[in-house]
C-alpha cells in the first residue's frame, strides 16, 4: 500500500472518529472532500459501507447552504473561468437578480427553485425509471420487428467480424449488474485486498477491466442471445401460422404456448442491457412505419371530408375497425351522409389503401390498431422515463456546481465545467442502482468528477494528452508538492519514483510530458521594442549572413578565374565539378556532350587544373578553402583537386 493510499485511509478514519465523537452524522460533502479524485464506484461503496456499519448517519448538506450561493464567490468564479474583468455593479443591480443577463446567475436562480430529494424520493424516481424500462422492453418484445432484430444481432454477434459485444450491450451496466449479483459472495478479506491496490494505473486498469469483462461475459451473452433467437423463431412461426390459417393477421392472445414464450422472451431480454443505439434501431423502424401509417390515415380523412363526412363520424367508423374488403362492403350500406358516395367514387383509392394497410400488417405482424396501441404504449413509457430522469437530474444540479467549482482555472470556463458535469450527471442517472442502498449522490459524484476531468484532459491543453496520462501527471504533481512540504526542497525524480513505487524512467517521461507549450508570440522584456520569443529562436534552415556573403564572393571570384581559361576548359571544369549546375558529371557524360572520348576529357581537365594552380590564379581562391565534398557545387573544389 502506498503512502498516498495510507493518507486517504487516514482521512476516512479521522472523519469516522469525528462523526462518532460528535452527533453521529457526516455530510456527503465531507466524504467527497476526503476522497481523492480518482476514487472508483466500488471504493466509494466500501467507504459508505464502513460508515453504515459504524451507525453513522450520512446527511445532505444544509438545504439553505446548498441553495445559497454567495454572489461574491460566484462573481469571482465567473471572472476566473471567463477571464473577463467585470466592473463593480451597483447595489440596485445586485439586489435585482431577476433582471440580470448573467447566464450563470440565471442558471443558478432556476436551479434553486428545485427541491432537494430525500432517499425515499430518489428510490421512488429510480423505480419510475425502472418501471419505464420494463414497460418498454415488454412492448418491444411483442413486436415481430424486434424479434427479427434480436435474431439478426445474434447472427452478427456469433460472426465476430460483423459485431463486437460492446456494439450490442452496455458493458458498464452489465458489469454493474454482475457485480450486484455476486456482491453477496464477497468477503471482507477480498475487500481489504482491493483497497490496497495501487491507484497509479486507475484508468489503464479500467480499460483492462472493461476488456476483461467483455471477454468474461461474452459466452454468457452469446448463450442468452441464442436462447432469445430461438424463442423469437418460435414466436414468429406461430405468427406465420396465424396468417396462414386466417385471412389476415391476428394476435395470439389465447395461445398458452405463445404467451409462455412471450413471457420467457421478456425475462431474457430484461437480463441483457442493450445499448441505446440498438434500442433506438428498433424504435426508429417502428416510428417510421407509424409515421407512414399516420400520413395514410390523414390523407384518407381529408378525402372523406370532401364528401361531407364529418371528422367525428369518420373517427367513429374508422378507429378500432379492421380496414379490409369486409369493412368496405359494410360501409357501402352505411346510410350516413357521404360514405356511400365516397366508397363508390373512390373505390380504387380505397382498394389501394386496404392493400397498403394489409402490407403494413404483414410487415409488422400486428393488426394496424394493435400496432398503433403498441407504439403509443412505447411512447408513453419513454415519456415517463424521460420525465423521471429529468426530475432526478434537476434535483442534483447543485452537486454539479459544488464539484465544478473545484476545477476552476484548469483551462475550461466555468460554464463548460458545469456542462460537462451535467453530462456526467445524466450518465449517473442511467447507471444508478437504488437497490444497493446508497444515496444517488454517491454515484453521481464519481461520474461528475470523471466527466469534468476527462473534459479538461481532452479540451484544456493545446496538445492533447491521454486521460490516463493526465491522471498520472496529477498524481506526480501532488506527490511532488507533498514531498516539498516534508523535505523543504524540490524532490528529485528518483525520490518521487520511490514514493510512488513507479519506475524512474516513467517519472521522467511523465514530467517531460507535463510541460506546457509556450507561444512563440509571447512578448520578451518590459520595453517597447516589440520583441517576441520566436525572434530569439535559431532557424536551423536559414543561411547565416556571413555565409551568404562568402558564398556570393566565392561565386564571383570563381567566375572571374574560370574566365581566364578557354571556353572549352571552363565548360569541362564546370560540368566535372558541378559548378553552377545541379550535380557533377562523369568523364563519359562530359565526353558525350563534346563528342570526344573520356580520355580526351581527362586530358582537358588536367590541363585546366594545372592552369588554375598557377600562383596568379590560385591566390585568388586560397582564402575560400573548405572541407566540402567534391561535387557539391562548391567552387573551392577546384583547389582541392
Curated annotation (Swiss-Prot):
Give this protein's Gene Ontology molecular function annotations: DNA binding; sigma factor activity
Annotated DNA-binding residue span(s) = 587-606
Q: Name one GO biological process term.
A: DNA-templated transcription initiation
Q: What is its main location?
A: cytoplasm
Q: Which GO terms describe its cellular component?
A: cytoplasm
Motif (Interaction with polymerase core subunit RpoC) on chain: 416-419
Q: Where is this region: Sigma-70 factor domain-4?
A: 561-614
Composition-biased stretches (Acidic residues): 180-197
Q: Where is this region: Sigma-70 factor domain-2?
A: 392-462
What's this protein's function? Sigma factors are initiation factors that promote the attachment of RNA polymerase to specific initiation sites and are then released. This sigma factor is the primary sigma factor during exponential growth.
Subunit architecture: Interacts transiently with the RNA polymerase catalytic core.
User: How is this protein named in the record?
Assistant: RNA polymerase sigma factor RpoD
**Which species is listed as the source?**
Rickettsia bellii (strain RML369-C)
Amino acid at each position: 500500500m502506498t503512502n498516498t493510499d495510507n493518507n486517504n485511509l487516514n482521512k476516512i478514519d479521522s472523519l469516522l472518529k469525528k462523526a462518532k465523537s460528535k452527533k453521529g452524522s457526516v455530510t456527503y460533502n465531507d466524504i467527497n472532500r476526503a476522497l481523492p479524485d480518482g476514487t472508483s464506484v466500488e471504493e466509494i461503496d466500501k467507504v459508505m459501507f464502513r460508515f453504515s456499519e459504524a451507525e453513522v448517519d450520512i446527511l445532505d448538506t444544509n438545504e439553505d447552504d446548498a441553495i445559497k450561493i454567495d454572489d461574491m464567490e460566484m462573481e469571482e468564479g465567473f471572472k476566473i473561468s471567463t477571464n473577463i474583468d467585470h466592473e463593480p455593479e451597483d447595489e440596485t443591480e445586485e439586489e435585482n437578480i431577476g433582471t440580470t443577463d448573467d447566464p450563470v446567475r440565471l442558471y443558478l436562480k432556476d436551479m434553486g427553485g428545485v427541491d432537494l430529494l430525500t432517499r425515499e424520493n430518489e428510490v421512488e424516481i429510480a423505480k419510475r425509471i425502472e418501471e419505464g424500462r420494463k414497460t418498454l422492453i415488454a412492448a418491444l418484445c411483442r413486436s415481430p420487428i424486434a424479434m427479427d432484430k434480436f435474431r439478426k444481432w445474434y447472427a452478427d454477434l456469433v460472426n465476430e467480424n460483423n459485431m463486437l459485444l460492446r456494439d450490442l450491450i452496455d458493458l458498464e451496466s452489465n458489469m454493474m449488474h454482475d457485480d450486484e449479483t455476486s456482491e453477496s459472495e464477497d468477503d471482507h478479506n477480498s475487500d481489504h485486498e482491493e483497497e490496497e491496490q495501487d491507484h497509479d494505473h486507475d484508468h489503464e486498469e479500467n480499460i483492462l477491466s472493461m476488456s476483461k469483462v467483455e471477454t468474461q461475459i461474452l459466452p454468457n451473452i452469446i448463450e442468452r442471445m441464442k436462447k432469445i433467437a430461438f424463442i423469437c423463431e418460435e414466436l414468429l412461426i406461430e405468427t406465420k401460422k396465424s396468417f396462414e390459417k386466417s385471412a389476415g393477421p391476428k394476435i395470439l392472445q389465447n395461445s398458452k404456448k405463445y404467451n409462455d414464450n412471450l413471457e420467457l422472451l421478456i425475462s431474457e431480454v430484461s437480463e441483457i442491457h442493450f445499448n441505446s443505439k440498438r434500442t433506438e434501431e428498433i424504435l426508429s423502424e417502428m416510428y417510421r412505419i407509424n409515421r407512414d401509417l399516420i400520413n395514410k390515415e390523414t390523407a384518407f380523412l381529408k378525402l372523406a371530408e370532401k364528401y361531407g363526412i364529418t371528422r367525428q363520424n369518420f373517427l367513429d367508423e374508422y378507429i378500432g375497425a379492421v380496414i379490409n374488403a369486409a369493412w368496405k362492403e359494410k360501409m357501402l350500406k352505411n346510410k350516413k351522409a357521404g360514405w356511400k358516395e365516397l366508397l363508390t367514387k373512390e373505390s380504387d383509392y380505397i382498394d389501394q389503401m386496404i392493400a397498403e394497410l394489409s402490407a403494413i400488417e404483414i410487415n409488422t405482424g400486428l393488426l394496424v390498431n394493435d400496432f398503433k396501441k403498441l407504439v403509443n404504449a412505447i411512447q408513453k413509457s419513454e415519456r415517463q422515463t424521460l420525465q423521471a430522469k429529468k426530475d432526478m437530474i434537476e434535483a442534483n444540479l447543485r452537486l454539479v456546481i459544488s464539484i465544478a467549482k473545484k476545477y476552476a482555472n484548469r483551462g475550461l470556463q466555468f460554464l463548460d465545467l458545469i456542462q460537462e458535469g451535467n453530462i456526467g450527471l445524466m450518465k449517473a442517472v442511467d447507471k444508478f442502482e437504488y437497490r444497493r442502498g446508497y444515496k444517488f449522490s454517491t454515484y453521481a459524484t464519481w461520474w461528475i468528477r470523471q466527466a469534468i476531468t476527462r473534459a479538461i484532459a481532452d479540451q484544456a491543453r493545446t496538445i492533447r494528452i491521454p486521460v490516463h496520462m493526465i491522471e498520472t501527471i496529477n498524481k506526480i504533481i501532488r506527490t511532488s508538492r507533498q514531498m516539498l512540504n516534508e523535505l523543504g526542497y524540490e524532490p528529485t525524480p528518483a525520490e518521487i519514483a520511490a514514493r510512488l513505487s513507479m519506475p524512474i524512467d516513467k517519472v521522467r517521461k511523465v514530467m517531460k510530458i507535463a510541460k506546457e507549450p509556450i507561444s512563440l508570440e509571447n512578448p520578451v522584456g518590459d520595453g517597447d521594442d516589440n520583441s517576441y520569443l520566436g525572434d530569439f529562436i535559431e532557424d536551423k534552415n536559414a543561411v547565416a549572413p556571413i555565409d551568404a556573403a562568402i558564398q556570393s564572393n566565392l561565386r564571383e571570384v570563381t567566375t572571374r578565374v574560370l574566365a581566364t581559361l578557354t571556353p572549352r576548359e571552363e565548360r569541362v571544369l564546370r560540368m566535372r565539378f558541378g559548378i553552377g549546375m545541379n550535380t557533377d558529371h562523369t568523364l563519359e557524360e562530359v565526353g558525350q556532350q563534346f563528342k570526344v572520348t573520356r580520355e580526351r576529357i581527362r586530358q582537358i581537365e588536367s590541363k585546366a587544373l594545372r592552369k588554375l594552380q598557377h600562383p596568379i590564379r590560385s591566390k585568388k581562391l586560397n582564402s575560400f578553402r573548405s572541407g566540402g565534398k567534391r561535387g557539391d557545387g562548391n567552387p573551392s573544389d577546384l583547389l582541392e583537386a
